[in-house]
Amino acid sequence: AVCVSLLGASSIRPLPLHLGQFNNMIKCTIPGSTPWWDFSDYGCYCGYGGSGTPVDQLDRCCQTHDNCYTEAQKFSGCSPYTRKYSYECSEGTLTCKSDNDECAAFVCNCDRSAAICFARAPYNSNNVDIDLEAHCQ
């Protein structure tokens, strides 16, 4: 086996395990998007952590997604950041499959709901990389 490290080769952060699935769900609902690039540093809640009042509808989608992940963690042994699940994308429609266990089904529905929310929310480039201390208290 060959291991190649790309650390430092790109300014884009690697996706934690299952977040690649969330990334692909967003691509399903917003074809042509680059979710990890477009949404990882948006508003007060899109990306790592979150606090304060969401700056707009899209940021509220991220806040709701964060809250959903908090709820998922209440299931025994359920880690939403690493939990893989089964889903399908067909012509922009996402379906969480019935073979998911309770944790996977919950996380899948968190991601599905967020991807649909993202697709419906306006994207304001002024809300990318905002001053969190000034806008998110």
From Swiss-Prot:
It is found in: Secreted. It catalyses: a 1,2-diacyl-sn-glycero-3-phosphocholine + H2O = a 1-acyl-sn-glycero-3-phosphocholine + a fatty acid + H(+). Pfam families: Phospholip_A2_1 (PF00068). Binds 1 Ca(2+) ion. One of its GO terms (molecular function) is calcium ion binding. Its EC number is 3.1.1.4. Belongs to the phospholipase A2 family. Group I subfamily. D49 sub-subfamily. This is Acidic phospholipase A2 PL-I. It comes from Walterinnesia aegyptia.
